[in-house]
Amino acid sequence: MKQCVRGATMAIALNMAGGALAAPGKPVPYWASLSQDEARMRVGPSLDYPSNWVYRRRDLPVKVVQVLGLWRKIEDPDGAQGWMHVRLLSDTPTAIVKADAAPLRQAAGDGAMALFRAEKGVVGRLSGCASGWCNFDVKGQRGFVKADQLWGATDK
């Protein structure tokens, strides 16, 4: 019985610490994304510090620029910096369209047929980037986008 309780306590503790979220031990800077529908950026690495931003956009890409315990200093796509708890972050590779409009193409190449267009500010998931092109998924609409039209985990 003690063994079962001890195991459950350990599982809960690992889950609360964020498990494999936000790449502990990874050299900075590195890419992460928001794992929650709402996430607060704070002016310092503690719940005692006030929030300077509240994000309401799951999968928004962020760049982790500093690590302090369970806190990550992040930079958002607009350049704002602040601190977030590791539980609010994920290693899911995402990006945001920074061009006015980015065609999602059937294949990686300028001559490939454009399937969709993603407007500036659209967030999607990445499933790989190579030779200047990224496989970009926006809520099930998939295509290849030029990496220089995106901000996020395009260097993986």
Task: List each language-model region with its residue ranges.
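N-terminal signal peptide c-region/cleavage motif recognized by signal peptidases
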Residues: 17-19
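Bacterial N-terminal signal peptides that target proteins for export
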Residues: 1-9
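Short boundary/loop segments of OB/S1/cold-shock single-stranded nucleic-acid-binding domains
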Residues: 48-52
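Sequence-pattern detector for short linear motifs
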Residues: 9, 43-45
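Repetitive helical segments and hydrophobic/amphipathic motifs
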Residues: 11-15, 102
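SH3-family beta-barrel domains
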Residues: 21-43, 54-58, 65-142, 147-156
